[in-house]
Amino acid sequence: KIKPSVVYTHHSGDLNIDHELTHRAVMTACRPQPETSVKQIYSFEILSSTGWFGYAQQKQYIANKYIDISAYLEQKLEALRAYDTEMREVPHARSYDNVEYLAKHRGASVGLHAAETFFVERWVEGESM
């Protein structure tokens, strides 16, 4: 039986309904029950989905965890080539240039060359769970 301690999912504020439902399913599956192994849940942002929902407070993406990806930015962009049919030309938010821009912008906001951000949905410390 798989017992993950960390789970990554779409943000609840993604405009894509499948992303929103995925988030809801993950949060439901990872209910904080005594037998759960999940101690950390992070949601991530997707250009052309997360920021397009609107600015209702409960749906707003707020980056509160930053991971330095400076050494891996080129690998990230190369990995996106597997989804080439999903990518668009500039000025579309989901262009290679804008994915790179966002990583550099997120990094610059915390003194790094590039960063991936997450919203911490849950963070539990200790062994009692």
What are these regions (language model features)?
Residues 1-129:
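Metal-dependent de-N-acetylase/amidase catalytic core
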